Amino acid sequence: MESEEVDNKFTWVIKNFSTLQYDKIYSDPFVIGGCKWHLLAYPKGNKFNNSLSLYLVVDDARALPCGWRRYAQFSLTIINQLTDKLSQRGEKQNWFNQRNLGSGFTSMIPLPNLHAKNAGYLVNGEVKIVVEINDLEVIGKLDVSEESEETNQPLKKIKLDDNDAVSFDSLNETSPVKESIDVNGFQVLPSQVESVKCIFERHPDFASKFRPKNRHLKSTYMTVLLGLIKTLCQLPEELTDDDLDEASVAVSYVENGGLRLDWLEKKLAEVKAKKKKVETGKARLQRAEEELQKLNQKCLELKAFLEKENADVSEANVPLSFEDVV
């Protein structure tokens, strides 16, 4: 297996994929945003389905201090080596901690599609996977100090200093720094301003009982909230059960800080209902299509039968000639 680490991306090349004998495999550890990670894959599928399962996992978690946490917005991509348009990409945001070391997708791509000849996912026995972490916030010690990092990554980090006080740093001084803007007491990125303003306009009192005073923790809560909203804006059929379970956990986490999210809970319930409706509707459509195929086949058989009967009738319905009678 080969790997390559560039900025906030890590590429994992799995060689001899078709002949792997292991039920699960791990990438080499890599560092993004001062944190160690590795990828976990199930090349033969898991017990729930016949698809490649893929996860981002915290590496060497036992070495981390008590109470550590990480929030990451990340994507996992199965590269199509013939055309990028067919690459299979999934996005997630998740809190990682001692009880939740990994997050990802149980059904990244169906194994028949992955192994299909000339499909572009398995080329010369190799499968290429890319993980990209676009937003990272850390509570606890970093795995790797800023001085020892070789990459310049514009990732956000929250960490505890030696006195367990919360401080905010960019990855290093050469990294581009995004200036934050105050919106109703929350420091947010320029790209988030309009979204946060819209939330306050529609729900003016939703943060009236918000308890945390530290501006970095407040930013963390708002980031989680915006991630939740982004999740709910996806097509229901694109959301997995894991996505919705994590969304429910995230809602509880944010509400514990004092934010009133009854409006978001209703939307989450609505999305869950829509997803269920889509799933049951697709099942009904599939059954209807199968029945239609059977009916079409029956129609073809009846048409052939009618043609044969018409031919037999036409053949029999011929008068005898004088010569035939005599």
From Swiss-Prot:
<protein>
    <recommendedName>
        <fullName>MATH domain and coiled-coil domain-containing protein At3g58370</fullName>
    </recommendedName>
</protein>
<dbReference type="InterPro" id="IPR008974">
    <property type="entry name" value="TRAF-like"/>
</dbReference>
<feature type="coiled-coil region">
    <location>
        <begin position="259"/>
        <end position="312"/>
    </location>
</feature>
<dbReference type="InterPro" id="IPR002083">
    <property type="entry name" value="MATH/TRAF_dom"/>
</dbReference>
<keyword id="KW-0175">Coiled coil</keyword>
<dbReference type="InterPro" id="IPR050804">
    <property type="entry name" value="MATH-CC_domain_protein"/>
</dbReference>
<feature type="domain" description="MATH">
    <location>
        <begin position="7"/>
        <end position="133"/>
    </location>
</feature>
<dbReference type="Pfam" id="PF22486">
    <property type="entry name" value="MATH_2"/>
</dbReference>
